[in-house]
Amino acid sequence: DWVADVMIPNLLSESTRQHLPGVEARVREQIADCPPVTISWIQRAMAARPDSLPVLEDFAGPVLVIVGENDAMSPPSEALLMAQAAREATLVEVPDAGHLTPIEAPSIVAKAISEWLAERFE
């Protein structure tokens, strides 16, 4: 499917595509199952959304920012800006992952979230 061929390199890291072919297959299936009108709507909504950095600047609570080392859509440099905008932020960069970190590296993401929550709320 040409839509998946275009989207996959922006969603998954090269490492994921090479070493975890099942992940790529699952994402391809999800893209194929998504109606074209929905994909179009999502693309327009993302293009029109306002900058969220002011929201982070105004938020008084703790923030966890998780980003894939090879995220082509929201690169680590943007994640760093998010973390810097927040009053209290933790930035976690997931090695060898792209934009879909919970799918590409679920154990790393789950550990980062559980440790972050435990440090703040236990």
Where are these regions (language model features)?
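Structural signature of beta-strand start/N-cap positions in the alpha/beta core
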Residues: V55, P62-L64, R87-T90
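Short beta-strand/loop motif that positions the catalytic acidic residue
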Residues: F59, V65-V67, D71
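Glycosyltransferase donor-binding loop in the core domain
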Residues: I31, D71-S74, G98-T101
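Generic recognition of short, well-ordered alpha-helical segments
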Residues: G22, P54, S77-L81, E104-I108
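Hydrophobic "lid"/C-terminal helical patch
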Residues: M7, Q43, M82, V109, ...
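Short alpha-helix in the alpha/beta-hydrolase fold that links the catalytic acid
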Residues: G61, P75-Q84
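Conserved alpha/beta-hydrolase catalytic His-Asp/Glu region
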Residues: W2-D58
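Catalytic active-site module of serine/aspartate enzymes centered on a nucleophile-bearing elbow/loop
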Residues: R87-E122
